[in-house]
Regions:
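Sec-dependent N-terminal signal peptides of Gram-positive bacterial secreted proteins and lipoproteins
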Residues: 6-28
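A residue-level marker of the well-folded mature domains of exported/periplasmic proteins
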Residues: 3, 26-259
Length: 259
């Protein structure tokens, strides 16, 4: 069997998080021409640790690139896009279609009406429903085996929810199925409030501080759409200085090592 060698080069824009991933593969034979695949990668933010985890190992080879149009002009064979707004991919779809460049959306799913526009549009992402169910199952198992979670002993768990962002399908599904799963597992809930924190630790800490100011020690459970926001909630409680036994239980999603 022939051994294949691959070189990877990435061009990334610091402003919009764009990259061109160049994959070159060739066999050991000298008479074969090297084949190169140029993949444009566009992420909505470089501040999201989950997204950064996809590109960290490539950062040594970063160079500037301004926008999606330049990726198409650069001759990319495929575009991989993490949308800023899942409801507004029409322009990039039109541009890619005009050049016959397949598009793979990831982590933020476009609305179905956009995905069915063209047979070369794809979506790759986690199963948000399953994530919500798993979070609910883990939380329910803990709550049902730790009676101290119900601090006021009223038979209900007073909770707040940190949601990723308005209109994000993953946030909607994670929220819906985590709460449904808790109730399905005989956890009686009383919702105190919810806050949007844009998947961000700092914003979650600020929102959690507001919730603590409003509800104090009434909060018995914090459900978060991701680990970053859950860690923000932890920081808020550290800042407030509550004794550890007065903290609520806090659950996130993503499996970040720090969490």
């Amino acid at each position: 069997m022939n051994k294949k060698k691959r070189r990877v080069a990435v061009l990334l824009s610091a402003t919009i998080g764009s990259a061109v991933l160049v994959l070159s593969g060739c066999s050991g034979k000298s008479d074969q021409t090297e084949k190169t695949l140029r993949v444009g990668v566009i992420t909505y933010t470089q501040d999201d640790p989950f997204i950064n985890g996809l590109t960290d190992e490539l950062k040594e080879q970063l160079k500037a690139m301004e926008n999606k149009e330049q990726m198409i002009d650069a001759g990319c064979d495929v575009l991989c896009i993490n949308l800023v707004d899942r409801t507004a991919p029409s322009r990039i779809i039109r541009m890619a279609r005009n050049e016959d460049i397949p598009v793979i959306f990831f982590n933020r799913e476009p609305v179905r009406e956009d995905l069915v526009q063209w047979e070369k549009l794809y979506y790759v992402g986690c199963d948000a429903e399953q994530s919500g169910i798993m979070q609910g199952e883990i939380a329910a198992e803990y709550i049902n085996s730790h009676s101290e979670v119900d601090k006021n002993k009223d038979g209900k768990i007073q909770y707040v929810l940190l949601e990723g962002e308005a209109g994000h399908q993953d946030a909607i599904s994670r929220t819906e199925y985590s709460v449904k799963t808790l109730m399905k597992n005989d956890v009686i809930l009383e919702k105190l409030s919810y806050q949007l924190a844009d998947w961000n630790r700092g914003q979650a800490e600020n929102r959690m501080n507001r919730l603590i100011s409003q509800y104090g020690k009434k909060i018995e459970l914090v459900m978060s759409n991701n680990d970053e926001m859950a860690l923000g909630a932890v920081e808020a409680y550290r800042t407030v200085g509550y004794a550890r036994e007065d903290w609520p239980v806090i659950f996130g999603i993503d499996g970040l090592e720090e969490a």
